[in-house]
Amino acid sequence: MSFKIFVINLERCKEKREKMIKKLEGEEYEMTMAVDGKELNKDTLKALDVELLKQWKDPWSGRNITWGEVGCSLSHYNIYKYCVENNIENAVILEDDIDIPEKLSNILDNIIDNLNKEISNWELCYLSRKPINSEKENVNEFKDFVKVDYSYWTCSYIINLKGMQKIINSNYHKNIIPADEILPILGNISPHKDYYKYYNIQEPLNIYSVKNMICYPEGNAFEKSDTENSKIIEMYEDDLLVLATGTDMTDGLKRFINSCKIYGLKHKIMGLNTQWKGGNMADGPGGGQKINFLLKTLDDLNDDQIILVTDSYDVIMSANSKEIIEKYKSFNKNIVFASESACW
């Protein structure tokens, strides 16, 4: 065979595993233990050298990513890494909640053979998918395949070595989003263009699909899905940025910076080592230069970033980002002025 079949299954999901073993009787495959989102936290992500794309929001609900989605994404990513390290030419990746046809390997052999004949530059081919913009697809270009537009699902697909290498090279592990969102982004077929800048996309991933799906999600697949039904991640530590102006490293500024470090607050000192031209606050207005520093800094930040702007020379922080953000959210306002009592 010119491919290796991988089945992604959570260790605690014994029933799904046993069903897939029966469905794949007579086939050669590797049962791959999935990364369990229930066992992940920010410390385990750090140990894995993995980071979330904190700016990502679900395009339909606006929520953050779930721990189950992170586990799913890492499960697929780990297979890519394994195949690249072991020079596996083609990987067939199946999730454990799909129905598959009989004589799967024979069908896959024919699909890969036809892919190589019809489309020399293919890198990923869906075996099942949920097309979102099917009206944009040219179904007459190829006999057995279609060059896809924006599509969902990663429950069954073929990906070759070049495609897996592209995903690894994209810096995906430092900007994790759901698995079925990253593929359209890397293929330059996602409508969510704001996220493209976070990935190294030198050449788009060449994504196709079989015209007639050969695998289908089980009828209750989404009801029992760990990705859909797991805990939404609160981005407290990553969402808050403390901004303060300080042109000279005085004792007061050192105390302020030290207090930020004690409470684990991400902070940025604006204007450090810049000549102060704003005047003496004791004798008259002196804030104009601060505003200019702030405007320049805001231009480089994401629109979703939560910011605390504060003085520095006569201020120390006395709460962590989670507590500050919870108090900020309790106001139910985008901007809160004179919020000293809520923050320090």
Question: What spans do the regions from the language model cover?
Answer:
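GT-A fold catalytic core of metal-dependent nucleotide-sugar glycosyltransferases
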Residues: 83-126, 293-344
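Short coil/turn segments at secondary-structure boundaries
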Residues: 254-258, 272-273, 321-323
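Active-site catalytic motif of lipid deacylating hydrolases and related acyltransferases
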Residues: 28, 259-282
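N-terminal G-site helix/loop of the GST-like fold
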Residues: 21-26, 252-267, 330
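Conserved beta-strand elements of beta-rich interaction domains across eukaryotes
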Residues: 12, 214-215, 247-249, 274-275, ...
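An acidic/histidine-cluster motif and surrounding catalytic segment
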Residues: 1-94, 98-237, 251, 275-276, ...
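Active-site-proximal beta-strand/loop segments in catalytic clefts of secreted hydrolases
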Residues: 10, 127-130, 245, 272, ...
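Hydrophobic targeting segments
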Residues: 3-7, 238-244, 260, 267
